[in-house]
């Protein structure tokens, strides 16, 4: 009797696999196509790449790129905000499908996740208040410098400038606010984020010195999701070829930030 029940269960699973028996074997790409929904994460606090505008809407360059990728794949993009220091854990834990949140491609991160081809180029830049006498990072001795926790900016300063007191913040919005309040001498963030701060937040800051280092920014995807990675790279190339990328980049920066 038990044998008959087991055989019946196996037969039913075979017959009705389309309703759930084999869902566990679906790839992320197959699930995305089936649901027609692509979930992606960012902090929502990294203007002008991803942030909440005055009307409470999540906007920015990353958001437009994500929507365009989803459109090329024939699905809808669904964003999710999360703190930066937990974003890779969220991805590997399958909380969302990918990270489209201005994440730099690094050797350390490549040990945990895969990355798409770069979708823009950026660099770490030191910023100070407009009335500061600091010309570059070599002028900082036992100074306080702000960074966002878990960023490449934090690890770079820790390794190369041990004499600095590094203040950590959850977001660039908090980082910029602290500099304006005089709680530190300088901050390090992405070049484009700092350059947009005066117009975006009315924070009167300026560049101090040249880029500390150059970064390639990519879409982060779980290592096992090779099919999804291929689809994202194809979508990005299509966007470049048909002018979609140029249009988005010009909208936010008045230049093509994929050009070095």
What do these predicted ranges mean?
Residues 22, 63-72, 149-151, 218-258:
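Extended ligand-binding regions for polar small-molecule ligands
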Residues 27, 64, 78-89, 132, ...:
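Short helix-initiation/N-cap motifs at beta->coil->alpha
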Residues 29-31, 128-145:
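Flexible hinge/capping segments at coil-to-helix
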Residues 36-42, 137-150, 165:
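Short loop->beta-strand "edge-of-pocket" segments that line small-molecule binding or catalytic clefts
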Residues 44, 121-128, 195-237, 255-260:
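Periplasmic-binding protein-like
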Residues 25-102:
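Extracytoplasmic small-molecule ligand-binding "clamshell" domains
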Residues 86-89, 103-111, 158-159, 180-214:
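A ligand-binding cleft/hinge motif common to bilobed small-molecule-binding domains
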Residues 17-20:
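C-terminal motif of bacterial Sec signal peptides marking the signal peptidase cleavage site
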């Amino acid at each position: 009797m038990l044998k008959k029940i087991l055989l019946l269960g196996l037969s039913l699973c075979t017959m009705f696999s389309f309703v759930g028996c084999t869902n566990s074997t679906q790839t992320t790409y197959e699930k995305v196509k089936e649901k027609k929904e692509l979930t992606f994460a960012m902090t929502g606090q990294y203007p002008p790449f991803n942030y909440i505008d005055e009307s409470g809407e999540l906007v920015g360059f990353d958001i437009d790129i994500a929507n365009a990728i989803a459109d090329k794949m024939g699905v809808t993009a669904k964003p999710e905000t999360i703190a930066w220091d937990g974003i890779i854990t969220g991805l590997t834990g399958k909380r969302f499908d990918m990270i489209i949140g201005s994440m730099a491609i690094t050797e350390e991160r490549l040990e945990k996740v895969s990355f798409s081809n770069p979708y823009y180029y950026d660099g770490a830049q030191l910023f100070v208040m407009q009335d500061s006498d600091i010309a570059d990072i070599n002028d900082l001795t036992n100074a306080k410098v702000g960074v966002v926790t878990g960023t490449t900016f934090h690890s770079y300063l820790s390794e190369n400038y041990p004499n600095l007191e590094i203040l950590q913040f959850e977001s660039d919005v908090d980082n910029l606010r602290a500099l304006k309040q005089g709680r530190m001498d300088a901050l390090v963030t992405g070049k484009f984020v700092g350059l947009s701060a005066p117009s975006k937040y009315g924070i009167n800051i300026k560049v101090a010195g040249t880029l500390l280092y150059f970064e390639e920014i990519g879409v982060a995807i779980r290592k096992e999701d090779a099919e999804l990675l291929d689809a994202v790279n194809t979508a990005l190339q299509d966007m470049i070829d048909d002018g979609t990328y140029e249009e988005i980049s010009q909208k936010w920066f008045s230049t093509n930030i994929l050009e070095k």
